[in-house]
Amino acid sequence: MTGYQDLDWANDPVPKLRKFYNLERESIAHFSASDVAIEETHFSSGVGLKFTPEKISYGTDILYFHGGGWIVGSPWTHKTLCSWLAKFAERRVYAAPYALAPENKFPKQANQASEITNSFLKTRDKILLAGDSAGGAMVLCAAAGVIEKNKILGIASLYGAFGCTKGTSHQTYGDNSVDLKMSALFAMYAHLGCEDPSEFQAKLSLSGAPLLLVKAECDPIADDNDWLAQRTLHPVTHMIAKGQAHAYLQECGNSKEADASMRKIAKWINNLV
């Protein structure tokens, strides 16, 4: 049987990638935080997941956008990560679905992120935005299109992908990365319809709420964070995960390093309130 690491993310058919990505994420679901209730809930984009920790200390909810290079992933593939975020932040996390490529081309995803967020805000005074990888960019697309921007308390972008391909990190880790290679990154942007990143980057919010940029040190797209920080007016806090690769937070519940990093992310979030 094909294993997750045997997949060719640059050339394999997307349905195959989705199948085995889902299986891989299902295999770690048992590492989810045991004292967090997980249930289905509805968004303007469809059915997603709600994570309710046993201990709730803060009333401001987190709206979460999952990663997966815009071609794979769902709230279900990020159950483990979101459950630990909910536990450590002591607040509810809502993971929303969104349209994937190549069936849906950009800017569908960016526009949908704004629609989801505006709908989510209709019944809330304040929210926090968080997302990883592709979702780390989706939160900035969401923030750019929010009608009531003062309702966004903060934004946490976890090893976000912002359309860069030529930095030092891309050259250093692009060929030997376990979780993300440059060939796969180019393929993902192509599936999205964004071989030219300028249209994609133009959809990212450039001002507003405090922004946390979490960078995995051994990640090909680590330099994307520096590129964004140089161009944004968001108040930026940098967090570097030493020795970690892309998507390392999927190891929460099974890695002391991932857990420690998620605790720091939760602390940053909670210090905003």
Predicted segment positions?
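A glycine/proline-hinged amphipathic helix-loop "lid/cap" segment
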Residues: 1-54, 273
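Alpha/beta-hydrolase superfamily serine-hydrolase fold, recognizing
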Residues: 4, 43-49, 56-273
